[in-house]
């Protein structure tokens, strides 16, 4: 993910409505919930493809739908199913972060493409692809999908768009970031400005609220 798309202009248009909402904890920003996921065709495409691609088809030497990549992932998830929730979160973060970072332009010939877990396991990927497979992994382990989001942010240090995964956990919001080895609290991050976040049912726009 190299830039914030024109969708940002749509999000900003809702600012007057969102500013009346109570403050949200994520990075100390307010948020405005929405249900129209049609604004996010790439995200909807990921959800649809993931359902189809979870079917164990294809050969182990296939270039695209390689069932062995899925088998390895599923084996990993089974191996940590007995662990406590916090350990599972750390293990999932580490598992995904071992994959090589590859720009969408190199993988798919376009500047921004949201890959399904199966595509990420085969092709590697960029920031949102790490976030997506982490979310799908934790969902499969039994975590509540309503507590997790893919969060698109502006990295004010590098001045680029970025994406991470967030999960509500024990009165905190934990951030799983491909740029950071450890799982950390959102309270300890000050260089990310959240733009929007999505899960399977809703999306949110984020607006400044001030931080303590």
What are the residue ranges of the model-derived segments?
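Residue-level detector of alpha-helical hydrophobic segments embedded in or interacting with membranes
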Residues: 1, 17-18
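Sec-dependent signal peptide recognition
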Residues: 2-9
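Short, linear, compositionally biased motifs with a strong N-terminal bias
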Residues: 10-11, 142
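N-terminal signal peptide c-region/cleavage motif recognized by signal peptidases
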Residues: 13-15
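A structural boundary/capping signal
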Residues: 18-212
């Amino acid at each position: 993910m190299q830039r914030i798309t024109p969708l940002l202009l749509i999000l900003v248009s809702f600012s007057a409505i969102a500013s009346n909402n109570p403050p949200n904890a994520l990075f100390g920003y307010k948020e405005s919930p929405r249900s129209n996921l049609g604004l996010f065709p790439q995200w909807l495409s990921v959800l649809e493809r993931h359902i189809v691609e979870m079917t164990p088809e294809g050969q182990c030497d296939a270039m695209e739908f390689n069932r062995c990549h899925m088998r390895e992932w599923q084996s990993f998830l089974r191996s940590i199913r007995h662990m406590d929730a916090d350990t599972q979160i750390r293990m999932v973060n580490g598992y995904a972060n071992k994959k090589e970072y590859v720009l969408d332009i190199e993988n798919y010939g376009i500047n921004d493409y949201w890959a399904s877990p199966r595509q990420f396991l085969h092709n590697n990927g960029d920031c949102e692809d790490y976030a997506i497979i982490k979310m799908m992994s934790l969902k499969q382990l039994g975590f509540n999908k309503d507590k997790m989001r893919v969060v698109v942010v502006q990295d004010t240090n590098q001045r680029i768009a970025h994406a991470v995964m967030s999960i509500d956990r024990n009165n905190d919001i934990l951030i799983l970031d491909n740029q950071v080895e450890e799982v950390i609290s959102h309270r300890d991050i000050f260089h990310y400005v959240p733009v929007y976040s999505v899960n399977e049912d809703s999306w949110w726009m984020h607006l400044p609220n001030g931080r303590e």
